């Protein structure tokens, strides 16, 4: 099926000739040293209260469970809406993230707000379906009202060195998304090494990702400061070469304000103030929002 799909595409791009995939320039020890340094420095652009407001406004409030239904999704959307408090200068979350069958429900519930509808699509979370099936699900989500698509790369193909097919799949989904934002999940817990994470980030960026995202939240190892830093370094290297800002989304396991503040401090120290808005930074979370909201004075 993949061969038949490729035969229908024009102007095939060879990822290996388009960009030379670079090895990650830091050792594991240097990664730890940098994380400690950035954590110690903190956020140079915001105090803690400002950072908590920023974090809340960057959350993709998420429900991705087999038990999801209309009532669950409508309640999630109402929760996202209710965080907004003009008197306390608190904005709503950036988006809600749901499975494609609930996109239309979320779209209707969020009508008249600034909150986007994000959908996981493309054989989330395993990515183990033919590209034709992935594209069909992405198109369905968009037809149902999704503003943003969160796809996951084919880790098995990446780990066997089939970088071209990984690139082609992301590129095809990018084209299907048209004006919708595409977040590309690397599932860093399965990629294992910093070098793999860095190369996968380069492939996703080259294929047109608007965001690169750490994790599905469906395996044991989700967003870590280490994987987050490696991905930020890939974004920074791309920006220094091209001037293009690629956005970042850690997701999975960020369930308390202290952890979220640490991630934001790393973001601020690596990429700077230009990335400090919800166009360029998101956090995927379900439990974090209430705790951050309660911390805001």
Please annotate each region the language model reported.
Residues 2-5, 9, 14-15:
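Short, positively charged and aromatic/hydrophobic N-terminal segments
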Residues 16-122:
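N-terminal capping/small domains of soluble enzymes
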Residues 17-59, 87, 243-297:
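C-terminal alpha-helical cap/extension of soluble enzyme domains
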Residues 49-50, 69-91, 103-108, 112-115, ...:
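Alpha/beta enzyme core
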Residues 58-63, 120-125, 157, 190, ...:
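Residue-level preference for alpha-helix termini and adjacent loops
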Residues 99-100, 224, 256, 285:
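Helix N-cap/beta->alpha junction signal
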């Amino acid at each position: 099926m993949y061969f038949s799909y490729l035969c229908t595409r024009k102007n095939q791009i060879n990822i290996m000739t388009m960009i030379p995939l670079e090895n990650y320039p830091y050792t594991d020890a240097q990664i730890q040293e940098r994380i400690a340094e950035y954590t110690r420095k903190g956020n140079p652009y915001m105090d803690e209260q400002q950072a908590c407001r920023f974090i809340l406004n960057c959350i993709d409030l998420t429900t991705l469970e087999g038990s999801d239904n209309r009532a669950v999704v409508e309640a999630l959307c109402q929760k996202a809406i209710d965080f907004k408090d003009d008197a306390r200068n608190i904005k709503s979350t950036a988006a809600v993230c749901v499975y494609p069958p609930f996109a239309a429900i979320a779209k209707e519930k969020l009508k008249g707000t600034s909150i986007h509808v994000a959908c996981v699509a493309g054989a989330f979370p395993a990515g183990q379906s033919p590209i034709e099936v992935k594209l069909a699900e992405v198109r369905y989500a968009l037809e149902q009202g999704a503003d943003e698509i969160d796809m996951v790369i084919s880790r098995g193909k990446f780990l066997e060195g089939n970088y071209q097919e990984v690139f082609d799949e992301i590129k095809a989904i990018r084209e299907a998304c048209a004006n919708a934002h595409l977040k590309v999940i690397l599932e860093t817990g399965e990629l294992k090494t910093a070098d793999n994470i860095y190369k996968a980030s380069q492939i996703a960026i080259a294929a047109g990702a608007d965001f690169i995202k750490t994790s599905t939240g469906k395996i044991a190892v989700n967003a870590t400061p280490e994987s987050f830093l490696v991905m930020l370094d890939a974004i920074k290297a791309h920006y220094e070469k091209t001037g293009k800002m690629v956005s970042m989304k850690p997701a999975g396991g960020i369930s308390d304000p202290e952890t979220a503040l640490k991630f934001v401090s790393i973001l601020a120290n690596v990429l700077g103030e230009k990335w400090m808005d919800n166009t360029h930074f998101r956090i995927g979370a379900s439990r974090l929002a209430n705790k951050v909201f309660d911390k805001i004075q």
